[in-house]
Amino acid sequence: MRTIFHIDVNSAFLSWEAAKRLKSGDSFDLRTVPSAVAGSEKDRHGIILAKSFPAKKFNIKTGEPVRSALEKCPELILVKPDFGTYRWYSNKMFGLLCDFSDKIERYSIDECFLDYTGMESIYGEAEDGARLISQRIKDELGFTVNIGIGENKLLAKMAGELE
């Protein structure tokens, strides 16, 4: 039986923005307050691309117009997207994951599937391996991930979406 991990960065663009700022000496973590990465309303790209967990409490949704999000939460901190930073963090994460398996399938900039089959003798049972991966990403890169475990990609993705 195969063991597949679905690895998904939590609020990727916002998490990567926060990690970058903390790494460069900023003491304020965007993930702890209502905040969002969003395009510019002026340039007619004014939608929410990613939001913090505190912003979710105001029912702010990904893809929502900035104007609507600000009506729900006037103190929402907005950050312009920096896709170069997001590519850098994505590539660093995928590089780290190569330490655990050479069978990795990128699903998007912030998600992938990792075939953990046969790795138990090195890193322990699947749950132990998932915890190790999650902890290394947090310690080395400064952000968190959800990891779903299943016998195939569909089940792994579904498991990762469970709360």
Task: Describe each PLM feature range.
Residues 1-163:
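Gly/Gly-Pro- and Ser/Thr-rich, intrinsically disordered tail segments characteristic of DNA damage-repair
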